[in-house]
Amino acid sequence: MYVVSTKQMLNNAQRGGYAVPAFNIHNLETMQVVVETAANLHAPVIIAGTPGTFTHAGTENLLALVSAMAKQYHHPLAIHLDHHTKFDDIAQKVRSGVRSVMIDASHLPFAQNISRVKEVVDFCHRFDVSVEAELGQLGGQEDDVQVNEVDALYTNPAQAREFAEATGIDSLAVAIGTAHGMYASAPVLDFSRLENIRQWVNLPLVLHGASGLSTKDIQQTIKLGICKINVATELKNAFLQSLKNYLTEHPEATDPRDYLQSAKSAMRDVVSKVIADCGCEGRA
């Protein structure tokens, strides 16, 4: 009952004018903080993991943890495959019980991207699994990229409609100027492009690379159709910096049950802020 597909979550967000945050988890403490905070705020959240996270923790272990915590807190949770690229890997995890998938073939030419994504969609929809795919590519900040090159990396609004119709995806991740990781300076998001995509595509839209974005920018993207906000680096950085500071100030510390508390507190602040920025408190 409590481990759910993201499809209904994102459709509700689209109707309600808010976004659902997807937090990439890397250890037990991250998952505890995300679930506890979401439950306290009655906010819908998505537990996301890259292939590396699933390899590190084990698919069955992650599924068991999410299921147990959803029941413990009486709070619906979705567990989501983030940036997965291999069909066989996705199929295995779906058969294990995962109900939300992002197939990332955005590095491929347009026609091949469609073909790869449609293969995954056709398989996943047999299991009532929701599928997200990306059109366009996120990068880092590269000063030597020319305007026409940047445009080629961003999501083309007209192509977005063709892509959505040809693949049958449930949500679309768009490239409008965000990047994975934290920003050295404030990014310039292409809001007009996002608005055009919204006019061409009626699916819930997804924003990757949201770590470090301002509240104003996040809320503006939501007004223009973003229904899912991905956060990873911001959580990792909060965990790491707090842990470093604690161990520097308490070099005698040896018990992780003690020294991880400050790291959890720092992550809790991040999760609370993202939920507030997404406007999803009280929506679960």
Swiss-Prot record:
The active site is at D82. Keywords: Galactitol metabolism, Lyase, Metal-binding, Zinc. Binds 1 zinc ion per subunit. It is an enzyme of class 4 (lyase). Zn(2+) binds at H83, H180, H208. Dihydroxyacetone phosphate binds at G181, G209, A210, S211, N230, V231, A232, T233. InterPro entries: Aldolase_TIM, Class_II_FBP_aldolase, FBA_II, TagBP_ald_KbaY/GatY, TagBP_aldolase_GatY. It catalyses: D-tagatofuranose 1,6-bisphosphate = D-glyceraldehyde 3-phosphate + dihydroxyacetone phosphate. CDD domains: TBP_aldolase_IIB. Its EC number is 4.1.2.40. GO terms for biological process: D-tagatose 6-phosphate catabolic process; galactitol catabolic process. One of its GO terms (cellular component) is cytosol. Its cofactor is Zn(2+). Pathway: Carbohydrate metabolism; D-tagatose 6-phosphate degradation; D-glyceraldehyde 3-phosphate and glycerone phosphate from D-tagatose 6-phosphate: step 2/2. One of its GO terms (molecular function) is zinc ion binding. Forms a complex with GatZ. Catalytic subunit of the tagatose-1,6-bisphosphate aldolase GatYZ, which catalyzes the reversible aldol condensation of dihydroxyacetone phosphate (DHAP or glycerone-phosphate) with glyceraldehyde 3-phosphate (G3P) to produce tagatose 1,6-bisphosphate (TBP). Requires GatZ subunit for full activity and stability. Is involved in the catabolism of galactitol. Belongs to the class II fructose-bisphosphate aldolase family. TagBP aldolase GatY subfamily. This is D-tagatose-1,6-bisphosphate aldolase subunit GatY. The lineage of its organism: Bacteria, Pseudomonadati, Pseudomonadota, Gammaproteobacteria, Enterobacterales.
